From Swiss-Prot:
This is Small ribosomal subunit protein uS12. InterPro entries: NA-bd_OB-fold, Ribosomal_uS12, Ribosomal_uS12_bac. Residues 111-123 have a biased composition (Basic residues). GO terms for biological process: translation. The modification 3-methylthioaspartic acid is found at D89. Pfam families: Ribosom_S12_S23. The gene is rpsL. With S4 and S5 plays an important role in translational accuracy. Interacts with and stabilizes bases of the 16S rRNA that are involved in tRNA selection in the A site and with the mRNA backbone. Located at the interface of the 30S and 50S subunits, it traverses the body of the 30S subunit contacting proteins on the other side and probably holding the rRNA structure together. The combined cluster of proteins S8, S12 and S17 appears to hold together the shoulder and platform of the 30S subunit. HAMAP family: Ribosomal_uS12_B. Belongs to the universal ribosomal protein uS12 family. Residues 1-22, 100-123 are annotated as: Disordered. Part of the 30S ribosomal subunit. Contacts proteins S8 and S17. May interact with IF1 in the 30S initiation complex.
């Protein structure tokens, strides 16, 4: 136990919390340009071809971002909005692209959970 004199001389250190999404710099979303759109395979025990894009953000960061939903229209030089949220079985992918904003289209034929995939309400 420290004495009061010791604490006056050198106060207790506050533990600093490290951000899970440093490239967003405390913003809810960030805009960026796709530099590469590709598929990659997940860690064991899962098996799939996950759609991922490499994005150069407006603040200079370059990050990998997951493209959720079935089918997408992204290619190189597409302007996308990314949000935080990692993909557990893809190492190094800590961001998601926001569907239905900027150059990213919503998911076609989606009826449930539409707001997460940028799909308009069916007539």
């Amino acid at each position: 136990m420290a004495t009061i004199n010791q604490l006056v001389r050198q106060p207790r250190k506050r533990s600093v919390e490290k951000s899970d999404v440093p490239a967003l710099q405390n913003c809810p979303q960030r805009r960026g340009v796709c530099t590469r759109v590709y598929t990659t395979t997940p860690k064991k025990p899962n098996s799939a071809l996950r759609k991922v894009c490499r994005v150069r953000l407006t603040n200079g960061f370059e990050v990998s971002s997951y493209i959720g939903g079935e089918g997408h229209n992204l290619q190189e030089h597409s302007v996308v909005l990314i949000r935080g949220g990692r993909v557990k079985d893809l190492p190094g992918v800590r961001y998601h692209t926001v569907r239905g904003s900027l150059d990213t289209s919503g998911v076609k034929g989606r009826n449930q959970g539409r707001s997460k995939y940028g799909t308009k309400r069916p007539k």
